[in-house]
From Swiss-Prot:
GO terms for molecular function: 3-dehydroquinate synthase activity; metal ion binding; nucleotide binding. It comes from Geobacillus thermodenitrificans (strain NG80-2). Zn(2+) binds at E186, H249, H266. Its main location: cytoplasm. This is 3-dehydroquinate synthase.
Length: 366
C-alpha cells in the first residue's frame, strides 16, 4: 500500500492507495483525532452497498465507532437536490454533530454528493473519500463537490477538501467494463493535458481495456492522481491552471445535461468532448493531430467518437455557454496546443456552431 500527502494552499491530507487500503481506515481515523465513539455516516449507492457496505461497516463497528449509513440510487441522476436533501435529513435524524465524519463509499457521484453534504451540514463537517471506481481517481482528489441542476452539471457546489482519501484497489475488481472505460477517459485526459511521456506509455501499453489491470491499472491511478494533485496544489480554487482539468468537459457536460444525466457515462461524454476539443484545436492553431488518430484510438476502447444524432448544435451551444468557465455568455474551452500543453481560449458562437456541425458530419473528426 502506498501512502502520500495531497497538498493544497489551505490543507494537507493523506492518500492511501493499494490493495487492502480500506483496512487502514480505523488507524487513519484515530490519527485524524476521531476516537472510538465518533459518529461515522457512510453515504453509498445501491450498486456498491451490496458489495462493500457490510464489510466496511463491520470493520468500523469492530473498532468501536458509531456507524450509520444511507444508500442513494446509483448513476449520475442521483446528484440531485432531492437526494442531497434526503442525505441531510438522514444526517440530522442520526444526530450527527460537528465532530462526526461522513464517508463517501462509491464512485464520483457518491463522492460529489457526499462531499457537498459534508460541506453544508452544520456549515461544514469532515469527510473521507473512499473511491470504488477508476473515475473517482480524479474526482476524489481536489475538494470540488457538487450536485447537478437540469440547466447544468455540477452547478451547485463548493470547494471542500476531504480529511483523507482511502483508495482500496481491490474495489475495482467488481467494476463493470463500462465504468472502467468511463474512468479511463479521465486517465487519458490527464496524460493529454500535462504529460506526453505518460500519453506515449498509454498508447504503447494499454492497447485495450483488458490491459487495464494489475500494475498497469495502479500506475494509471498513481499518474492521474499525481497530475491532478500537482495542479490543485498550484490552483486550489480554479482561478487559473485548474481549469485545464476541464479539457473535454465543456462539450462533455453539455452532452450529459442535454441528453439527460446517465444516458452517457461521464467518461463517454468527456471522450466525445476531448475529440471535439482536438478538432477545434486543429482549426484554431492550424496544425494537425492526424498522426495520432485519436478517434481510432478512442474507438478501440469502445468509446463513442461522434455526437449522438439526436442532439442539435444550437442546443449544445446554449449548454456550453452555461459552463462554469464561460464569461458573460462567451464559451471558453480548454484546447490542445500540443500533447501535454493546453490553454483556455474564448470562442465565438458562429465558429462553434459551424465546428459542431462539421464535427457531427465527420463522425468525430476522424
Amino acid at each position: 500500500m502506498m501512502e502520500r500527502t495531497i497538498e493544497t494552499a489551505t490543507k494537507q491530507y493523506p492518500l492511501l492507495l493499494g490493495d487492502g487500503a480500506a483496512r487502514a481506515l480505523p488507524r487513519l481515523l484515530r490519527s485524524l483525532a476521531c476516537p472510538p465513539g465518533t459518529k461515522l455516516f457512510i453515504i453509498t449507492d445501491d450498486a456498491v452497498a451490496p458489495l462493500y457496505l457490510d464489510e466496511v461497516r463491520a470493520m468500523l463497528a469492530a473498532a468501536e465507532y458509531d456507524v450509520y449509513a444511507y444508500i442513494i440510487p446509483s448513476g449520475e441522476a442521483a446528484k440531485s437536490f432531492d437526494n442531497y436533501y434526503a442525505c441531510q435529513t438522514a444526517a440530522l435524524q442520526c444526530s450527527l454533530d460537528r465532530r462526526s465524519v461522513i464517508i463517501a463509499l462509491g464512485g464520483g457521484v457518491v463522492g460529489d454528493l457526499a462531499g457537498f453534504v459534508a460541506a453544508t451540514y452544520m456549515r461544514g463537517i469532515r469527510y473521507i473519500q473512499m473511491p470504488t471506481t477508476l473515475l473517482a481517481h480524479d474526482s476524489a482528489v481536489g475538494g470540488k463537490v457538487a450536485i447537478n441542476h437540469p440547466l447544468g452539471k455540477n452547478m451547485i457546489g463548493a470547494f471542500h477538501q476531504p480529511e483523507a482519501v482511502v483508495y482500496d484497489t481491490t474495489f475495482l475488481r467488481t467494476l463493470p467494463e463500462r465504468e472502467l472505460r468511463s474512468g479511463f477517459a479521465e486517465v487519458i485526459k490527464h496524460a493529454l493535458i500535462r504529460d506526453r511521456r505518460f500519453y506515449e506509455w498509454l498508447r504503447a501499453e494499454v492497447k485495450t481495456l483488458a490491459d487495464l489491470r494489475g500494475e498497469a491499472l495502479t500506475y494509471c491511478i498513481e499518474k492521474g492522481i499525481d497530475i491532478k494533485a500537482s495542479i490543485v496544489r498550484e490552483d486550489e480554487k480554479e482561478t487559473s491552471v485548474r481549469a485545464h482539468l476541464n479539457f473535454g468537459h465543456t462539450l462533455g457536460h453539455a452532452l450529459e445535461s442535454e441528453l439527460g444525466y446517465g444516458t452517457l457515462t461521464h467518461g463517454e461524454a468527456v471522450a466525445i468532448g476531448m475529440l471535439f476539443a482536438v478538432f477545434v484545436s486543429e482549426r484554431l492553431y492550424g496544425h494537425s493531430f492526424a498522426e495520432h488518430r485519436f478517434a481510432e484510438w478512442f474507438a478501440r476502447y469502445g468509446f463513442p467518437v461522434s455526437l449522438p444524432t439526436t442532439v442539435e448544435a444550437d442546443r449544445l451551444l446554449e449548454k456550453m455557454k452555461g459552463d462554469k468557465k464561460a464569461y458573460a455568455g462567451t464559451v471558453r474551452m480548454v484546447l490542445l496546443r500540443e500533447i501535454g500543453d493546453v490553454e483556455v481560449v474564448e470562442l465565438e458562437d458562429d465558429k462553434l456552431l459551424a465546428w459542431l456541425d462539421e464535427f457531427a458530419k465527420q463522425g468525430g473528426g476522424r
